[in-house]
A protein has these predicted regions:
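Extracellular loop-to-transmembrane helix junctions
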Residues: 2-19, 23, 77-108, 117, ...
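Flexible loop linkers connecting adjacent transmembrane helices
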Residues: 23-50, 74-76, 86, 90, ...
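Loop-to-transmembrane helix boundary motifs in multi-pass membrane proteins
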Residues: 126-141, 336-343, 416-426, 431, ...
Length: 621
C-alpha cells in the first residue's frame, strides 16, 4: 500500500480535530477566557511559576511527554498489521489522548497548577487522594523501567551508539554552565545552542571512528553494565541542579525531536514507501512472537503513549500549568502537543511496516524464536552491512525503528551513502527522546515520593534537604533499576503499558468529577467514554498478563523474585486505580444529588472578580 494518500488523510484528520473538536472543548466545555488569571501570573515567583511564550511552553511540554512510547509501542504493535495500530493511534489520540491531556491541563490550571493527586484530593476526597499519590509513585517506577529497558536494548553491544549518547552528557554540562552561569544575571541562548548542535554532530561522526578503533571494546557493553550506567545517570540527573544537566539536555533534545519528526514526515511524503505488512496478520488472534496476546486488549497497552498516556497527566499537572501565560493557550499546548505525539507514533508504525516482514521479525525476536516462525530474512545481511551493526535479535523496537527510518532516508537522492549515519542518528534520536523523560521522570518520582513520605515524617517533604533528596532519588532509581535488571521487553512493556493506561483512567475519572462538581455534568460524557474504554481494555490486559506471564514467573525457579514483584505491582496498581475510579463515580452521584463538592472555587479574573462559571451542581437532563 502506498503511504502518501494514507499520510495525507491522517494529517487532515488531525487538522480537522484540532480546528473543531478542540475548539468545542475550549469554548463550550472549559469556557477558556484570557481574563482569567493563570497560575503563572497569580503565583509568579521567577522559579516554578513563570509566564512564558506559548511556543516555549509547547516545546517544554512536548519534550516532557514525548518519550519512548510513540516510537516503541507502534513499532511492536506492527506485529498485528498496520490497520489496528493506525486506527487506534488516530482515533485514540483525537478522542481520548488529546482530551485527557487538555482536560488535565485546564483542571490543574483551575487548581492553581497543582498535581493530579492534589486534584483527586480536592474533587473526590482525602482518602482517595492518598491512594492516587501511591498509584502515581508506582506508575513512575514502572514507567521509568519501561523506558530504560528500551535504551538498554538499543545501546547494548553498540560502541557507536553508546559513545554518541555518552557524549551528550558533557555537551549538556557545558551548555548548562554557558547558558546560566557564564554571565551572572543573564541567560545566553544563541551561542550555546549553536555549540550544542555542532558538538552533537561531531559526536555522531566521532562515534563512527571510535567504533572502528581499538577504543571500541570500551564501549561494547552488555545489558547489565548499561543498566548500572543508566541508574547512576538517573540518580545524578534527579539530584543535580536543573540548570546543570536537565534543562540544557531538554532544550537541546527539543530541537532534535521536532527537527527529526519534520524531516521524517517530509521523507515519508517524498519517498512514500510501500507498506509491506498486511493490514492484519495472523497474530491478531494471539500467539505472536513479540506480544503473545490477542489484538484486544494488548494492542492498546502496547501502543500506550502514542494514543493516550497517563504519564502525560503528571506533566499536564506538573510544570506546564505553571508556565502558561494566557488561559486560551492551553488548547494549543494540551490538545496540540498530543496530536504531534500521535503523528510520531504513526511515522514509527509506517517505518516498521515498510520493512520486509521477515527482516522485521528477525530484528525484533530472539534468533531461537525466529527460527520457529517459518520466515526468512530478505535484506537483513545487506541492512547490517549498510548500518555497520549486527541487527538480528536486537529486540525492543528501537533498532527496527532506526532501520526503517534509515531505509526511508536511503530513498532520498544523495542520502544512500549516509545510511549508517541515519541509523545511528535514529538511535541517538530515540535515546534522547527517552533519557529526557527518564531524568525528568525520576525527578518527578522523587517529588511525589517526598510528598507521600511527608505524611510519615515532615522533613522528608523538604526539597532543600540533601539527605531527603538523595534517599528519595535512590529509592526510585533502585526500584526501576531492579525491574530492568531482571526483566525483558516482553515482561516490562506490558506492565508499563497497563500502569500507564490505568493512570490515564484515573486522570479521566478525576476530571469527570471536576466537570460534574463545577456544573458541567452535561459534558461529562467527553471524559466518561474514553475512561470506560481505557479501563475495560487495560483491566483485561492486566488480568491476562498477570495470570499468563507474571504469576507463572513467580512459581518458576529462577524467576520467583521478579515474578512476585511484577505480580504485586500490577495488582496494587489495578486495585488503586479501581478505588479512585469508583470513588470518583460516587462523588459525581453525590454532587448530582445536591451534596456540595469538596472544592468549588471559580477562576479569578484579572480585575479581582470571579469568572461567571457555575459552581453549583445541576442535573444533565
Amino acid at each position: 500500500m502506498n503511504t502518501l494518500p494514507l499520510m495525507l488523510i491522517i494529517v487532515g484528520i488531525y487538522a480537522v480535530a484540532y480546528r473543531y473538536y478542540s475548539a468545542f472543548l475550549a469554548s463550550r466545555v472549559f469556557a477558556l477566557d484570557d481574563r482569567n488569571i493563570t497560575p503563572a501570573h497569580r503565583f509568579n515567583d521567577g522559579h516554578n511559576y513563570v509566564p512564558s511564550p506559548r511556543w516555549v511552553v509547547f516545546g517544554h511540554h512536548f519534550a516532557a511527554i514525548a518519550g519512548a512510547g510513540p516510537l516503541v509501542g507502534p513499532t511492536l504493535a506492527a506485529q498485528f498489521g498496520y490497520a489496528p495500530g493506525l486506527l487506534w493511534l488516530v482515533a485514540g489520540a483525537v478522542l481520548a489522548g488529546a482530551v485527557h491531556d487538555f482536560t488535565t491541563l485546564v483542571g490543574s490550571m483551575r487548581h492553581d497548577g497543582r498535581s493530579l493527586p492534589h486534584m483527586v484530593l480536592s474533587e473526590v476526597g482525602p482518602v482517595t487522594g492518598m491512594v492516587a499519590l501511591i498509584a502515581v509513585v508506582i506508575d513512575v517506577i514502572i514507567a521509568m523501567a519501561g523506558l530504560a529497558i528500551v535504551v538498554v536494548n538499543a545501546l547494548s553491544q553498540s560502541a557507536w551508539s553508546l559513545f554518541t549518547i555518552g557524549m551528550t552528557i558533557p555537551i549538556a554540562l557545558v551548555m548548562g554552565w554557558w547558558m546560566f552561569k557564564s554571565q551572572p544575571g543573564r541567560v545566553l541562548v544563541l551561542a550555546p545552542s549553536i555549540f550544542g548542535a555542532i558538538a552533537l554532530a561531531l559526536a555522531l561522526i566521532a562515534g563512527h571512528a571510535v567504533a572502528g578503533s581499538s577504543l571500541a571494546s570500551i564501549f561494547l557493553l552488555g545489558n547489565h553494565q548499561i543498566v548500572i550506567i543508566l541508574c547512576v545517570y538517573g540518580f545524578l540527573a534527579s539530584t543535580l541542579p536543573v540548570w546543570m544537566l536537565l534543562e540544557p539536555r531538554d532544550y537541546l533534545s527539543t530541537y532534535i525531536k521536532i527537527g527529526t519528526i519534520a524531516a521524517l514526515l517530509i521523507g515519508v511524503l517524498y519517498v512514500h514507501p510501500r507498506l509491506q505488512f498486511p493490514a492484519f496478520t495472523q497474530y491478531v488472534h494471539g500467539g505472536g512472537p513479540i506480544i503473545p496476546g490477542k489484538v484486544f486488549p494488548f494492542l492498546f497497552v502496547t501502543i500506550a503513549c502514542g494514543a493516550i498516556s497517563g504519564f502525560h497527566s503528571l506533566v499536564s499537572s506538573g510544570t506546564t500549568p505553571k508556565l502558561i501565560d494566557k488561559e486560551t493557550e492551553a488548547r494549543f499546548i494540551g490538545y496540540g502537543a498530543m496530536l504531534v505525539e500521535s503523528l510520531v507514533g504513526v511515522l514509527a508504525l509506517v517505518a516498521a511496516c515498510s520493512m520486509n516482514v521477515g527482516d522485521y521479525f528477525a530484528i525484533n525476536v530472539p534468533p531461537s524464536v525466529f527460527a520457529r516462525l517459518g520466515l526468512q530474512p530478505v535484506h537483513l545481511a545487506e541492512l547490517s552491512k549498510l548500518v555497520g551493526e549486527p541487527l538480528a535479535g536486537r529486540t525492543g523496537g528501537p533498532v527496527s525503528f532506526a532501520v526503517g527510518m534509515a531505509e526511508i532516508f536511503h530513498g532520498v537522492p544523495g542520502m544512500a551513502r549516509l545510511t549508517s549515519y541515519w541509523f545511528h542518528f535514529a538511535i541517538l534520536f530515540e535515546a534522547l527522546f527517552i533519557l529526557t523523560t527518564i531524568d525528568a521522570g525520576t525527578r518527578v518520582g522523587r517529588y511525589v515520593l517526598q510528598e507521600l513520605l511527608n505524611k510519615v515524617h515532615k522533613p522528608f517533604a523538604s526539597t532543600r534537604s540533601l539527605a531527603a533528596n538523595l534517599l528519595a532519588s535512590g529509592f526510585i532509581v533502585l526500584c526501576w533499576g531492579y525491574l530492568v535488571w531482571g526483566g525483558s521487553i516482553a515482561t516490562i512493556w506490558p506492565l508499563f503499558g497497563t500502569a500507564n493506561q490505568l493512570l490515564a483512567a484515573i486522570a479521566l475519572s478525576t476530571m469527570t468529577a471536576w466537570l460534574v462538581n463545577h456544573g458541567k455534568a452535561a459534558f461529562a460524557w467527553l471524559t466518561i467514554i474514553p475512561a470506560a474504554f481505557v479501563l475495560a481494555t487495560t483491566i483485561s490486559a492486566a488480568v491476562l498478563s498477570t495470570t499468563g506471564v507474571y504469576w507463572p514467573m513467580a512459581r518458576h525457579p529462577g524467576t520467583e523474585a521478579q515474578g512476585w514483584v511484577e505480580t504485586i505491582l500490577m495488582t496494587a496498581f489495578v486495585v488503586g486505580a479501581v478505588i479512585v475510579i469508583v470513588f470518583s463515580a460516587l462523588r459525581c452521584i453525590q454532587t448530582l444529588r445536591g451534596v456540595p463538592p469538596p472544592y468549588a472555587r471559580a477562576p479569578e479574573l484579572r480585575d479581582g472578580r470571579t469568572s461567571p462559571q457555575p459552581a453549583a451542581p445541576f442535573r444533565c437532563c
